[in-house]
Amino acid sequence: MKFGMYYNKETIGDVLLVIYKSDVIPAYVKQRNDIVALFDKDNEIVGYNFLNISNSMKIKAHGQIPICSHQVIDILNCMLKNASFPLLDYLDESGFKVGQIVEMEEHPDSDHLHILKVDIKKDRLLNIVCGSFNAKVGLKAVVATENCFMPSGKQIIPEEVMGVFSEGMLCSGRELNIDGYENKKGLYILDDSYNVGDDFYTLY
């Protein structure tokens, strides 16, 4: 199951957050040792809070951790196993793909939305509704794919946008929390050194 992982000691303390469902308010929690497990009303895991995590590992992140080593997951799973909580899958892929716009048409019911066909080297093109002013055919950008987690904690869920199905999101530098892009609008444009279909965070 996909999850988001976050750590920022300055803002939330020495706590590693793991989020499975960003749109679900936990119904109850269970704490065992330094792990707080959050559950929904159906008794399914919503996420984990690993307290005092620096006692177990050193983390340099200041926000989202899009991918991490098997060693990190193995340490966390050892802690979860000792607390009798469900284990984590390896976080080998971030869900942020290098994509290229191959088709573009204007949304019939909007003066700024575009309907895009985006290639991420999947078995088919993705249909994505996008409002960025600099979107154009041929442009390479970062695609947040289905169920991946943004730096903000938001999970990307396929949905209809003004009547048109959208199954992902093309990202701005600000949405990706890239330094220097805090106040810049428009898609974060990738050059030809990026290959379509690659994981953005194995390259960035």
Regions found by a protein language model. Name each.
Residues M1-Y204:
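Phosphate-backbone binding interfaces of nucleic-acid-interacting proteins
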